[in-house]
């Protein structure tokens, strides 16, 4: 993934994978004709192709004719998918192929291949009556990457923690003069020299932090922990030299008894609880910002499907907020009474039961269904076209559940004020509605 992709884009990718895992886990097939294949980044396509050719030979000996044919068919499908790639993508490759049995009892072929959003270091080939998604689930478990700066009087260490993987990015030592009681008339001069050395040390730490933790003008970490003994970490967090983009990412200041690697390990232990709550805190902040716009009545907000989609089309949505379980379907219908027009509807499960939505009001002719998909899925695929960022939230925090219950689980923070009421009136006027008649 390129460094330009923001954490919001990454969250959308994660949501797509979660959705995919859910549908794959529910799928079941007859016999062992469902193939799960995961190829790690450094592997060779040629090795996997040879392994599949060997498997094809082995599968030809399966006694049950039906099972044999479906396994051979699945292996052939995987081979065709592999031919689309000249080499394994940077993050590895995941392929699921096979024949599943739908709820109606019909057989349906499934062919899925994609590159995960971060490197997958698992090699897997399995034929079974279900798809194996454990490796994908593990990929989602510990996604956020956190930065650590450990400072003490002897030097500084910069590291990252992602899941269970800790990495030291850089460290340097420093020789700071100690406090002392001698010096006579020079005592003030000594104190000033000491303060200057401290100041230069803090400045160097701030500069190195910017080099390591900022890529393409954006922080490449989800949060930052400042650790150390004495007062250095507080000095750094309040310093003007510390990059404001990183300042906003500081989650916690922790006191550690050591510097260097031991201090890094201690800081990870002490900050563990805060790191678990980061997603939760980010969500609270985002919805808090949305509620602030409403309470201050700035007009720079929208909620509900209609207003939000209208604002999206205007290009005025800066941040689009959606609940992860938004239960609204998007239908594209073709009207045969008026052959050129297509209608887009957004319906809840309750509204779907009312068949009048699918008939033309004037002619009473039933409209043809061209496509149907969950609205959130459509937004996840198209939000970039409207210049918005998409934030997918849960209802686990108090603010999240308030947003879902009170605002229907969809809304947005706008770049500028939009008057939705006058837009609705304009649309009615355009439909031949004359206010003078009333």
Curated annotation (Swiss-Prot):
GO molecular function: sequence-specific mRNA binding; translation release factor activity, codon specific
Descriptive protein name: Eukaryotic peptide chain release factor subunit 1
Keywords from the named record: Cytoplasm, Phosphoprotein, Protein biosynthesis
Family the UniProt entry places it in: Belongs to the eukaryotic release factor 1 family.
Phylogenetic placement of the source organism: Eukaryota, Metazoa, Ecdysozoa, Arthropoda, Hexapoda
GO cellular component: cytosol; translation release factor complex
Keyword rRNA-binding listed: no
Pfam families in alphabetical order: eRF1_1 (PF03463), eRF1_2 (PF03464), eRF1_3 (PF03465)
Gene: eRF1
Gene3D superfamilies attached to this UniProt entry: 3.30.1330.30, eRF1 domain 1, eRF1 domain 2
Domain of life, source organism: Eukaryota
Keyword Cytoplasm on entry: yes
């Amino acid at each position: 993934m390129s460094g330009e992709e923001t954490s919001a884009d990454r969250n959308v990718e994660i949501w797509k994978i979660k959705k995919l895992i859910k549908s794959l886990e529910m799928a079941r097939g007859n016999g062992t004709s469902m193939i799960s294949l995961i190829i790690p980044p450094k592997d060779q396509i040629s090795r996997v192709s040879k392994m599949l050719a060997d498997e094809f030979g082995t599968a030809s000996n399966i006694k049950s004719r039906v099972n044999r044919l479906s396994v051979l068919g699945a292996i052939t499908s995987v081979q065709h998918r592999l031919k689309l790639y000249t080499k394994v993508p940077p993050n590895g490759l995941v392929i699921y192929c096979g024949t599943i049995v739908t709820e109606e009892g019909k057989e349906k072929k499934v062919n899925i291949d994609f590159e995960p959003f971060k490197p997958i270091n698992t090699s897997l080939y399995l034929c079974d009556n279900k798809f194996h998604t454990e490796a994908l689930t593990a990929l989602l478990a510990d996604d956020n990457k956190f930065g650590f700066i450990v400072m003490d009087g002897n030097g500084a260490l910069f590291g990252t923690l992602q899941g269970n993987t800790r990495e030291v990015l850089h460290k340097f030592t420093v020789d700071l003069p100690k406090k002392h009681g001698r010096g006579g008339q020079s005592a003030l001069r000594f104190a000033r020299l000491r303060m200057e050395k401290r100041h230069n040390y803090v400045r160097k730490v701030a500069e190195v932090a910017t080099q390591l933790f900022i890529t393409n003008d954006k922080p490449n970490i989800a949060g930052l922990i400042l650790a150390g003994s004495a007062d250095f970490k507080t000095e750094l967090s309040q310093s003007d030299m510390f990059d404001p983009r990183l300042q906003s990412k500081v989650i916690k200041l922790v006191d550690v008894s050591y510097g260097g690697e031991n201090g890094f390990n201690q800081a990870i232990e002490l900050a563990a609880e805060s790191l678990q709550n980061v997603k939760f805190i980010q969500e609270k902040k985002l919805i808090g910002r949305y509620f602030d716009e409403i309470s201050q009545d700035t007009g720079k907000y929208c909620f509900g499907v209609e207003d939000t989609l209208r604002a999206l089309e205007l290009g005025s949505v800066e941040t689009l907020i959606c609940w992860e379980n938004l239960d609204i379907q998007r239908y594209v219908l073709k009207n045969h009474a008026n052959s050129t027009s297509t209608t887009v509807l957004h319906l809840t499960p309750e509204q779907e039961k009312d068949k009048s939505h699918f008939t033309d009001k004037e002619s009473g002719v039933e409209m043809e269904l061209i496509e149907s998909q969950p609205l959130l899925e459509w937004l996840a695929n198209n939000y970039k076209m409207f210049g918005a960022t998409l934030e997918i939230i849960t209802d686990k925090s108090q603010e999240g559940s308030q947003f879902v219950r009170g605002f229907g689980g969809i809304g947005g923070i706008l770049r500028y004020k939009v008057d939705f009421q006058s837009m609705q009136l304009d649309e009615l006027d355009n439909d031949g509605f004359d206010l003078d008649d009333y």
